[in-house]
Amino acid sequence: MSPHEPVTPESIDRLCTLADLPVPAERRKGLALMLAGLVAAANELSRKMADARYRTVVPILRFPER
Amino acid sequence: MTRTDVLNLTIREAAAQIERSALSPVELTDAMLQRIARVDKTLNAYITVCGEQAREVALAAEKMIRAGYHLGPLHGIPIAIKDNIYTRGVRTTAGSKILGDFVPQEDATVTARLKRAGAVIIGKTNLHEFAWGGTTDNPHYGTCRNPWNPERFPAGSSGGSGAAVAARTCLGALGTDTGGSIRLPSSVNGIVGIRPTIGRVSNHNVVPLAWTMDTVSPMARTVEDCVLMFEIIAGHDPLDDHSAQAPVPDYRGELGRGLRGLRIGLIRDYSLSHVQRAVGDTIRAALTTLESLGVEIEEIAMPSIQGNISAQLTIESCEPSTYHQEWLRTRPADYGEDVRTLLELGEMYLATHYLQAQRYRSVLRKEFVEGFKRVDVFVTPTLPFTATPCGATKVMIENNREEDMLSAIMQFTGVPSLAGLPALSVPVGFDADGLPVGMQVIGRAFDEATLFRLGHAYQQATDWHTRAPSL
């Protein structure tokens, strides 16, 4: 999914197929509207974290850190 | 002592009277149960009231104390527990239809520790379904309401615990906090709540929301009461893989040390930005009070702070959707509409989104570690707004612009959650409509003691925490 394209009910359909998640057709439009905003913000964060100054940063997946 | 006097006792005050047999645990428990019967039809703070069981435990506590065995400050004290925390033999629904008939065969570690300390479990409190949301507008067990104005929300997800404590139906409660679920209801209900460092308090037998951010902790009317509960539940638990080995300090011993020389950080363009005017004014007044107690205030830049809401939404979407994957496919209609939508959305992020959000946490944490070389704590409001009407999905913070509730509510509480740091919410005043405002104080990892010390000193110098809603 390109960040330049809006998320559509068809995009939701494809994602649900990939996730093996049955979502009734009537829910897809609402999900598309919400996901468009969430994915745009997540992509912005991903671009920030792809910056060279963060190249050595590893994810924290466990607290307390060991 | 009148019934009103009993209801207004703090844990410390009630404990002192119980220890010298001036107050009976049965009398105290009965007063709370009668209060629940009177006000909870309005508030809907409880999913299950453990009336008979609570009376039996209170009676046993009374007999023990008369026989000369006093277990400490929680002995005979009525405590409520959020309904996603296991209680052996008592239904634990997590606010859901899916777990509507679930009766655990074991206690959570935190429940067991409270029971061993002699606490009387008075009931299980309402919450946002599966703790995934900030309003406690629960489609299965009813909308929980704010004691200061029942037309307003109690926030969430531990909204039932917040409303129950503020309404004087228990002396303290346990909540859970992933992205703010203890601090948010503590703020809008005018009480104290602490999110601990991840690993400080066991999550064993607590229904998870997001494994890398979940915590359990107390909510009470005073910092001192939070400490009395925290001392009992904090500490290593071999049953929880995430539990820390860090030693538990003498929190009560630290409370009276005063604040002279303590350094508070305000995060530039963040700590006092994008908040309702009354919230900003109230926090500034609280800072002035703290300065009069000897703290020094410094502004610190934290360039990575922007991005925190997206990181939190990503992690808090993906992890719950993983836990709920099977039920979402077999029982989708048994979820409320908002939680079902969030769980479906959580399956649609990319793995790279999730991992970039977890990498962001490392960057944010490192900036806090640097900041803590200059200051001892950071301060923000707990929420940028006061309690909104029940059912609202939008909120207005400034410039007459409506914002999405879920993002707006996380503005300040998500940051310590992401960084794995402890944070205290303490009541610091009211807006013009009489709705409480809370201040969030963020500390170093495993330094809850400094948060308690600051909050206690503030409460010794002010009287916000002594005011009661007129229910």
Regions inferred by a protein language model and the residue ranges of each:
Chain B
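Short helix-loop capping/hinge segments that flank enzyme active sites or metal/cofactor-binding pockets
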Residues: L74-A94, R252-R268, I315-V369, P381-F385, ...
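Conserved hydrophobic/aromatic pocket- or pore-lining residues that grip, position, or stack substrates
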Residues: M32, A54, G76, K82, ...
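Short, surface-exposed loop/helix-turn segments at secondary-structure junctions
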Residues: K97, D101, H140, H242-A246, ...
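Structural helix-boundary/capping segments
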Residues: R12, R38, R116, A166-S273, ...
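Short glycine/serine-rich loop/turn segments
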Residues: L74-V216, D269, T380-R401
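Long amphipathic alpha-helix in the N-terminal Rossmann-like dinucleotide-binding domain
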Residues: E52-E62, G118-A119
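An N-terminal boundary/leader segment
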Residues: M1-E56, S292, R467-L471
